[in-house]
Amino acid sequence: MAEGKIFTVSVTVGQETTTANLIYSKAKTYNLPLYAILSPSKVKGYIFIEAPNKSAVEEAIRGIRHAKRVLPGEIPFSEIEHFLEEKPAVSGFEPGDIVELIAGPFKGEKAKVVRVDESKDEIVVELVSSVVPIPVTVRGEYVRLISKRQKE
């Protein structure tokens, strides 16, 4: 397989995923030579497309509503590699943080983080509203941070 080059496409902010899906559909329908499409959630207004040349990317975005233009130049893989590394959902939480449970049987409840287990992607919390503190283990994606622990 030929070595792909990575190009940056400017898109409407907030429409990155939609635009990437439309480009993917067009590439599949018309058998365009695109190798990969990356729409990182942390990057607003841009998506990255791997293709053999710039003209393949320009053909893919032609007629796509929210795709504006292909930026000049290529992006080295090392610049976008960190977007591909999966971080556990519990990274960033510390004991003492106040969180809100956003899924499961305790949805909507506020809780205090007791322990974080990054290897299992789980957090042990104590519900703030309960009279007796009972530790509850929940998955990392079931919590949303409300406030960080106050440092002395």
From Swiss-Prot:
The family database entries (SMART domains) matched by this protein are listed as:
KOW, NGN
MF-aspect GO terms: translation elongation factor activity
Compartments in which it is found: Chromosome
Keyword ATP-binding applies? no
Q: Which UniProt keywords apply?
A: Chromosome, Transcription, Transcription regulation, Transcription termination
Q: Which residues form the KOW domain?
A: 95-126
The UniProt entry, under InterPro entries, shows: KOW, NGN-domain, NGN-like_dom, NGN_dom_sf, Rib_uL2_dom2, SPT5, Spt5_arc, Translation_prot_SH3-like_sf
Q: Does the keyword Transcription regulation apply?
A: yes
Q: Which domain of life is it from?
A: Archaea
State the Gene Ontology BP annotations.
Answer: DNA-templated transcription termination; regulation of DNA-templated transcription elongation; regulation of transcription by RNA polymerase II; transcription elongation-coupled chromatin remodeling
Quote the disruption phenotype from the UniProt entry: Essential, it cannot be deleted.
Instruction: Provide GO CC annotations from the record.
Output: chromosome
What HAMAP family does the database record attribute to this sequence? Spt5_arch (MF_00950)
Q: In which family does this protein belong, per the annotation?
A: Belongs to the archaeal Spt5 family.
* Assembly behavior: Heterodimer composed of Spt4 and Spt5. Interacts with RNA polymerase (RNAP). The complex interacts with FttA.
The record describes the protein's role as: The Stp4-Spt5 complex stimulates transcription elongation on both naked DNA and histone-bound DNA (chromatin), facilitating transcription through the histone barrier. Neither protein functions alone. The complex also stimulates the transcription termination activity of FttA, neither protein alone nor the KOW domain of Spt5 stimulates FttA-dependent termination.
State the protein's name: Transcription elongation factor Spt5
The lineage, from the top, is:
Archaea, Methanobacteriati, Methanobacteriota, Thermococci, Thermococcales
